[in-house]
């Protein structure tokens, strides 16, 4: 069965794993998922991630992060969906929780945070909000 929105599946797997306090979560890998995981790691929302390739299939394993017994990620919300893509210019990229959260944006220069996209001067597709 083909998946209509693999990024939403990734975010849901992370959300569900954190609700039951799992140490890590595994999912099918792709270049975009790895780029999103890299942004989450750079921003301190996850401990680490690894890509394990087994033949033609590769899996992305994300080590989740907790602070004082609570998940570091409080909000993980998909913005741009296959049925309704959300694109923002460099001046219209939203701030999440007045700068306390992060919007992950797919730009021509790669997947990056809203702050980095504004600093670089590029717009793109708003993938999700993380707080």
From Swiss-Prot:
| GO CC terms in record | ribonucleoprotein complex; ribosome
What's the protein name? Small ribosomal subunit protein uS8
Organism encoding this protein: Paraburkholderia phymatum (strain DSM 17167 / CIP 108236 / LMG 21445 / STM815)
User: What are the top taxonomic ranks of the organism?
Assistant: Bacteria, Pseudomonadati, Pseudomonadota, Betaproteobacteria, Burkholderiales
Family named by the database record: Belongs to the universal ribosomal protein uS8 family.
Q: Which gene encodes it?
A: rpsH
The role this protein plays is:
One of the primary rRNA binding proteins, it binds directly to 16S rRNA central domain where it helps coordinate assembly of the platform of the 30S subunit.
> Which InterPro entries does the record cross-reference, listed alphabetically?
Ribosomal_uS8 (IPR000630), Ribosomal_uS8_CS (IPR047863), Ribosomal_uS8_sf (IPR035987)
Q: Which UniProt keywords apply?
A: Ribonucleoprotein, Ribosomal protein, RNA-binding, rRNA-binding
GO molecular function ontology, one term from the record:
structural constituent of ribosome
Q: How does it assemble?
A: Part of the 30S ribosomal subunit. Contacts proteins S5 and S12.
- Alphabetical list of Gene3D superfamilies matching this protein: 3.30.1370.30, 3.30.1490.10
Write out the GO biological process terms. translation
**Highest taxon of the lineage:** Bacteria
